[in-house]
């Protein structure tokens, strides 16, 4: 039996971004090299003189102003004419047969959305390697399997940096929540499953995703913590409540002065802290392929655990971070 060839013209690659910068240009260059006939929609805050670097066959540039990434995706999807859509981050680029493998799985399996592994860029700085290591740890990333080449499995959600699905599926569940600055992919995955849809992780649907530097990793985790409260306002989900563990950890750390008034708390505090640091120590050793990365990975995991709690606490206290300004990947 002759296998039906996948029509790459019936898929639109959607790339939301703030501005035109080198990571986005590289992303588009790779996409067009691999998929010259596949439509690409790039949704930006604004267009500038660099737009000429992106203007080529089958590429549409859309300027929206400073809006949420979810709303940008909604605008892009509404302007597509294809049956399938593939979301990709501006600081990423597809690996071999990314679209082909994703569409094949959508057609052959009883699923409505598919995503896959996020591989490191071939060339990274020391800090980026440490941030990447932290992202592989269960202490920082709940769905850490997507950072590794793990076996195929069904998921509660997958991040929209690498997600392929039918346009009609996206529209049926109402698209992304435009009011969420972060966590829109969690919310989207929740609504997919609520409607009886299955989400599949496959190690064959791969992209290369640039790791953040320490400054932008700190910012990402800070906004992630703030976003937990916004998600809980939408739905009292166990997974969202579980994410409050970072807040509890921060409160625990801030309780140190109590030891001066209640010595018994000093013993409890010390034992818990030693136990936690031991876990971070062994986790850092396990995921650091190069011994030279161990110390950097250790401290990056600490930052990844403490910073979300700060973001959550700021939100609870009634303050709002300038998420759109703070949250960026370049």
Locate each region found by the language model.
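A recurrent flexible, glycine/aromatic-enriched loop bordering the glycosyltransferase active site
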Residues: 120, 143-164, 181, 187, ...
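Catalytic donor/gating beta->alpha subdomain of glycosyltransferases that bind UDP-sugars
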Residues: 177-235
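Glycine-rich, basic loop-to-helix element that forms the pyrophosphate-binding segment
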Residues: 64-80, 101, 161
């Amino acid at each position: 039996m002759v296998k039906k060839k996948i029509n790459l013209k019936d898929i639109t690659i959607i790339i939301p971004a703030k501005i035109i910068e080198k990571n986005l240009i590289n992303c588009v260059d790779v996409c067009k090299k691999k998929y010259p006939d596949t439509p690409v929609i790039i949704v930006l805050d604004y267009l500038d003189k660099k737009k000429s670097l992106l203007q080529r066959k089958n590429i549409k540039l859309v300027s929206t102003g400073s809006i949420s990434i979810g709303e940008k995706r909604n605008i892009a999807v509404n302007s597509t004419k294809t049956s399938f859509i593939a979301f990709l981050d501006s600081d990423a680029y597809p690996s071999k047969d990314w679209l082909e493998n994703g569409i094949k799985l959508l057609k052959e399996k009883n699923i409505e959305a598919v995503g896959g592994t996020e591989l490191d860029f071939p060339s990274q700085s020391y800090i980026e390697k440490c941030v990447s290591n932290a992202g592989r740890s269960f202490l920082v990333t709940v769905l850490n399997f997507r950072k590794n080449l793990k076996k195929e499995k069904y998921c509660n959600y997958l991040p929209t940096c690498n997600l392929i699905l039918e346009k009609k599926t996206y529209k049926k569940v109402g698209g992304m929540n435009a009011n969420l600055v972060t966590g829109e992919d969690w919310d989207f995955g929740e609504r997919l499953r609520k409607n009886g849809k299955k989400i599949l992780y496959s190690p064959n649907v791969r992209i290369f995703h640039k790791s953040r530097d320490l400054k932008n990793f700190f910012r990402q985790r800070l906004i992630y913590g703030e976003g937990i409260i916004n998600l809980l306002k939408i739905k009292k989900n166990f997974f969202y409540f579980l994410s409050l563990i970072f807040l509890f950890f921060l409160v625990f750390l801030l309780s140190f002065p109590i030891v001066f008034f209640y010595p018994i708390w000093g013993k409890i505090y010390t034992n818990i802290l030693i136990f936690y640091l031991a876990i971070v120590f062994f986790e850092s050793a396990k995921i650091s392929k190069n011994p030279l990365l161990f110390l950097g990975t250790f401290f990056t995991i600490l930052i990844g655990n403490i910073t979300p709690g700060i973001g959550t606490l700021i939100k609870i206290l009634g303050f709002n971070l300038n998420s759109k300004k703070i949250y960026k990947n370049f």
